[in-house]
Amino acid sequence: MDNHGILESLLFTAGDEGLDEKQLLEILDMSKDQLVELIENYSSHGLMIQRFGTTYVLTTKKEAATYIEQLIEQKSQMKLSQAAMEVLSIIAYNQPLSRSDIELIRSINSDGAVKTLIAKGLVEAKVVNEQRSQQLITTDLFLNVFGISNIEDLPTTEEDDEEMDAFFSNLVNQKGENND
């Protein structure tokens, strides 16, 4: 079996989670340049290999979207409550954030929504820059679900950016932290 077949088999087996680049390089015993070339030269009738952050996933081609949508029209893989969607958007656009930051923004306890997002693999808690509290960030699965390659691909407008900057500047001042 050639490397294209092996790569396809690995990504198919990994499913929606995909495989991290480091894993692929180790299993296939090749350099990053060789992997990139292999992916660029990959061709299949209905499938393609996409990169979401550092994860590679075997996906269907866009041309098949309408047929696939018809197949799964009645099923929703990732149902989220309104609260979970609000929290997810707050994290996505302002990460990293602590749970208390989210509660300050929403003025309501958001632990349930955060736990749901973590359980679904869309968000993870990490210690960032040696801060005392865990910081919430989106995952590669989030990128995959929303069909973007990196967080900078999220839709935004200049006006929204200015409003968010002003809001977070005010939030930092309310918490008594330095703006520097």
UniProtKB/Swiss-Prot annotation:
Name the keywords, alphabetized.
Cell cycle, Cell division, Chromosome partition, Cytoplasm
> Which InterPro entries is this protein grouped with?
ScpB_csome_segregation (IPR005234), WH-like_DNA-bd_sf (IPR036388), WH_DNA-bd_sf (IPR036390)
Provide the Gene Ontology terms for cellular component. cytoplasm
Where is the protein localized?
A: Cytoplasm
Report the principal subcellular site. Answer: cytoplasm
Report any one BP term from Gene Ontology: cell division
Q: Pfam families, from UniProt?
A: SMC_ScpB
- Tell me, how does this one assemble? Homodimer. Homodimerization may be required to stabilize the binding of ScpA to the Smc head domains. Component of a cohesin-like complex composed of ScpA, ScpB and the Smc homodimer, in which ScpA and ScpB bind to the head domain of Smc. The presence of the three proteins is required for the association of the complex with DNA.
Q: Which family does it belong to?
A: Belongs to the ScpB family.
Chain's role: Participates in chromosomal partition during cell division. May act via the formation of a condensin-like complex containing Smc and ScpA that pull DNA away from mid-cell into both cell halves.
Please state what the protein is called.
Answer: Segregation and condensation protein B
Tell me the gene name: scpB
